[in-house]
């Protein structure tokens, strides 16, 4: 079922939904540059103002996956993505990136999909480059890295070439659009499990149900009530969990896991170099807030990956991986693996 750009814009203005097949058609046109920049910007604005529905987001994510350069991973057990929407304005160090190394050291397989900075002064791509990682890998090379180390990093522009038709429009608009919430939904390795942080509490219930429609196995979507797109130490965290086909929404608190509630102020960084230093502190078992929040988020990722039976069990495994030096060694191993392709 097709819809003209003008009809789509009218639906948005009238706060009516664009149906699944219509959204597929519309999104394909946008991704292929078949809609003028003015009309594309108007539709993206209209969707944002009326608020994107679960059906619209699911269809748009499906199209982005169609256009992606995919990564093939044979062994998909305990396979997880750890990702945030960004845009939370917290300017913290790269917690999800640090958590990736800890979770991999504790037995998860990670396919992390990331880009340069949005919410932080340093996106996952920025800090990985600062650590010496070669992020410019082909899909085949990413697959090899996952086989060798249990970690693959997929730099979004490499894996979503069709975004070149949308990037100038998004840049000129300078406001959040549906694409800000599509990134975490469009992992090119199709990881069946995910820990996803979001920038707004309303997105917890929306994104977990989108993941349900997209066929995820175990999805955990989180929003820290202090505004973080991570599991927070500074406040309660809203959780949407998809497991065994069922969605559950609940709150967790640091105290639930024997952790103290600590302000996240000490996690702020100015750039990728500061983020790298804080990440290395956490992986090197230096006592402090960075280590604690990485243990909490890596533990949640281990639960999402079905390595751990609960978040609490995951935190215990994460702490062991850090204390034993395995997490730091995993980082070094990953740097070496990516450098072999230079």
From Swiss-Prot:
Origin organism of this chain?
Answer: Cupriavidus metallidurans (strain ATCC 43123 / DSM 2839 / NBRC 102507 / CH34)
**GO CC annotations?**
cytosol
Pathway info = Amino-acid biosynthesis; L-tryptophan biosynthesis; L-tryptophan from chorismate: step 2/5
Write down the InterPro entries for this protein, in alphabetical order. Answer: Anthranilate_Pribosyl_Tfrase (IPR005940), Glycosyl_Trfase_fam3 (IPR000312), Glycosyl_Trfase_fam3_N_dom (IPR017459), Glycosyl_Trfase_fam3_N_dom_sf (IPR036320), Nuc_phospho_transferase (IPR035902)
Positions annotated to bind 5-phospho-alpha-D-ribose 1-diphosphate: 84, 87-88, 92, 94-97, 112-120, 124
Q: Name one GO biological process term.
A: L-tryptophan biosynthetic process
Kindly list the positions annotated as binding anthranilate 2. Answer: 170
Q: What class of enzyme is it?
A: transferase
- Keyword presence, Kinase: no
Pfam families documented for this protein: Glycos_trans_3N, Glycos_transf_3
Q: How does it assemble?
A: Homodimer.
Top-level taxonomic group: Bacteria
Cofactor comment text: Binds 2 magnesium ions per monomer.
Gene that this sequence comes from:
trpD
Q: Which Gene3D superfamilies match?
A: Nucleoside phosphorylase/phosphoribosyltransferase catalytic domain, Transferase, Pyrimidine Nucleoside Phosphorylase, Chain C
Q: What function is annotated for this protein?
A: Catalyzes the transfer of the phosphoribosyl group of 5-phosphorylribose-1-pyrophosphate (PRPP) to anthranilate to yield N-(5'-phosphoribosyl)-anthranilate (PRA).
Q: Write out the entry's keywords from A to Z.
A: Amino-acid biosynthesis, Aromatic amino acid biosynthesis, Glycosyltransferase, Magnesium, Metal-binding, Transferase, Tryptophan biosynthesis
**Binding positions for Mg(2+) 2 per the UniProt entry:** 229-230
Residues reported in the UniProt entry to bind anthranilate 1: 84, 115
Chemical reaction(s) catalysed? N-(5-phospho-beta-D-ribosyl)anthranilate + diphosphate = 5-phospho-alpha-D-ribose 1-diphosphate + anthranilate
**Gene Ontology molecular function, alphabetical:** anthranilate phosphoribosyltransferase activity; magnesium ion binding
Q: What is its EC number?
A: 2.4.2.18
**Cofactors that this protein relies on:** Mg(2+)
Protein family according to the UniProt entry: Belongs to the anthranilate phosphoribosyltransferase family.
The identity of this protein, by name, is Anthranilate phosphoribosyltransferase
Residues binding Mg(2+) 1, per UniProt: 96, 230
């Amino acid at each position: 079922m097709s819809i003209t750009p003008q009809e789509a814009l009218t639906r948005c203005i009238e706060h009516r939904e664009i149906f699944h097949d219509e959204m597929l058609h519309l999104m394909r046109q946008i991704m292929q540059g078949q809609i003028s920049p003015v009309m594309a910007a108007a539709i993206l604005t209209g969707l944002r103002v009326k608020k994107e529905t679960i059906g619209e987001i699911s269809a748009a994510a499906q199209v982005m996956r169609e256009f992606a350069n995919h990564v093939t991973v044979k062994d998909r057990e305990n396979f997880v993505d750890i990702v945030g929407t960004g845009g939370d304005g917290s300017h913290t160090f790269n917690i999800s990136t640090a958590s990736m190394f800890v979770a991999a050291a504790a037995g998860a397989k990670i396919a992390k999909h990331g880009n340069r900075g949005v919410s932080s002064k340093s996106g996952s791509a920025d800090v990985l480059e600062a650590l010496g990682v070669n992020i410019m890998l082909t899909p085949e090379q990413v697959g090899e890295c996952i086989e060798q180390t249990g970690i693959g990093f997929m730099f979004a522009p490499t894996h979503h070439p069709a975004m070149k038709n949308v990037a100038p429009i998004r840049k000129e608009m300078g406001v959040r659009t549906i694409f800000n919430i599509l990134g975490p939904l469009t992992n090119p390795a199709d990881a069946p499990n995910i820990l996803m942080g979001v920038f707004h509490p309303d997105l917890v219930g929306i994104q977990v149900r989108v993941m349900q429609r997209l066929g995820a196995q175990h999805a955990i979507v989180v929003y820290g009530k202090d505004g973080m797109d991570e599991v927070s130490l500074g406040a309660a965290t809203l959780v949407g969990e998809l497991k065994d086909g069922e969605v559950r929404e609940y709150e967790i608190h640091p105290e639930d896991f024997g952790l103290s509630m600590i302000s996240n102020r000490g996690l702020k960084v100015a750039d990728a170099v500061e983020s790298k230093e804080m990440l290395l502190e956490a992986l090197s078992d230096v006592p402090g807030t960075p280590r604690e929040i990485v243990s909490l988020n890596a533990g949640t990722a281990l639960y999402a990956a079905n390595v751990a039976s609960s978040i609490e069990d995951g935190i215990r495994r994460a702490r062991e991986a850090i204390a034993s030096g395995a997490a730091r060694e995993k980082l070094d191993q990953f740097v070496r693996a990516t450098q072999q392709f230079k």
